[in-house]
Amino acid sequence: MCTASPCDLEEIPLDDEDSDSLEFKILEFYVKHHVFQNTSAILSPKHLRTRSLSQKGPERWPVSEAWTQGPWPCRHSQSSEKAINLTKKKSSWRTLFGVAEKEEDSQSSPPEICAQAQRSGVPQARPRSPKWPRSRSSMDQRLEHKAADPRVVSIANRVAEIVYSWPPPEEVHSQGGGFKSKGVLVFQGPQGQSGAESTKKEGEDQIIARIVELLKYSGEQLERELKKDKVLMTCFQDVLSYSVVKTITDQFLRGVDTRGESEVKAQSFKAALAIDVIAKLTTIDNHPMNRVLGFGTKYLKENFSPWIQQHGGWEKILRMPHEEVD
């Protein structure tokens, strides 16, 4: 079932302290410049990040040429972020953290994504159209009226470098040569009053599992898949809460294999991926963007900020050059 009680939809109040926090500002800038703006120019369908790192051994992670072909268009906006040229060397997330890696050429054919959810016994509810363009416009106005903090810009851009260095999927072909998408979400219809709670929990688990899988795609592909699957979009909006956002992010990060890496490198990479996951969830929410950003700020503060401060701050754990944050 896709219904939720009022307590499920209760929002976490966004205090001034939260909206002025470094975590919130990083998420806010990342959403605007690395999820919504110029996404199609950065990530083409040929290079979708559709799997967790655990599906390939650490020593065999390929280096994708798609992420080393020059400066990203989004880095040339009117704000103070610096253009980042990646043509000098190929890099994976490991080399971004200073780990030597043998370069490999990776070629893949454009995968055809078939992730339309199969529906069985679901009442035809009137789908609610996503309202993120309006929220994005609101954020545009906000950022236009205040200069972006150079420190926030540098950290968000560094996070994007790390996230985009995540290797693309190996080619997986069916007999017809198409791409096999993992997991098909099947929504269950009403099962009677006695099993209502169980059905609701199962339905929520299915929604979370499907969202986790879709978050492995680029922001552009995620948006396309959700536009095709109105039931998934509506059901996610109905169950959205901090606990759901936390569960989705936790499950996504558990699928990332960082075996053989130091704690600092592993946690740094997961922190970057957490920011990317939370930013992409703003695409799905039907409420003002601040709602998901509030959830994301709380998640980062609870799960990463204390550890980051203990290890010298964002700049140090992300291995940022000193000149980027002067």
From Swiss-Prot:
GO terms of biological process kind: apoptotic process; regulation of apoptotic process
Q: Where in the cell is it found?
A: Cytoplasm
What is the residue range of the motif BH2? 307-314
Do the record's keywords include Hydrolase? no
Keyword presence, Glycoprotein? no
Q: Which keywords does this Swiss-Prot/TrEMBL entry list?
A: Apoptosis, Cytoplasm, Phosphoprotein
PTM summary from the entry reads: Phosphorylated by MELK, leading to inhibit its pro-apoptotic function.
Q: Where is this motif: BH3?
A: 211-225
Q: Which residues carry this modification: Phosphoserine?
A: S44
Which protein family is it in? Answer: Belongs to the Bcl-2 family.
Please report the name of this protein according to its UniProt entry.
Apoptosis facilitator Bcl-2-like protein 14
